[in-house]
Amino acid sequence: VISKYLKTLMDLGIVTKEIPITEKPGKKTIYLLEDNFFRFWYRFVPINSNAIDSGRMEKIYPKAVKQNFSDYMGLTFEKMCKDYLLYYAESLPIELRQIGKWWGTDSRRKKQIQIDIVGTPVNGQEYLIGSCKYRNEKIGLDELTLLQEYASVFGKGSKYHYFIFSKGGFT
């Protein structure tokens, strides 16, 4: 049972509840700040409040905000990529039932993994598996290899269609 405060934040659209796309609600539930203003505020303002109050923000901005901005934008970029796939859903190789993310444990490596985008099929065992990278650097084939490894850990489908989104482009 969630607290009344968390429920209120969810009702206001400030917080959202996420579970891995193919899982039933339970232990793997996480709560995220959905509202971009609140995400920015709580990511950058409290930790830099002294610099802001004393007028030094312009001087420390490159290290305090700019250096961490790509990490901050990652969640927003993931949403944009999901929206892109939904917009072009009719031209995708499968008919989507839903789209979300998935996380779990790679038992071979004993580490947590996350797949940014998983599209579940209306029929069959074909899934969309996607990665979203909001970085200035170009990404290479190693990202596809990693995504294929993650798909094998996900293990729900018999066939996967891979989509990789990159702000910086590809090598």
Question: Can you describe what each PLM-predicted range is?
Answer:
Residues M10-T22:
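A short, conserved structural fragment
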Residues I21, T29-T171:
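A cross-kingdom feature that marks ATP-driven nucleic-acid transaction machinery
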Residues I2, T16-E18, G104:
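Glycine-rich, charged/polar anion/phosphate-binding loops
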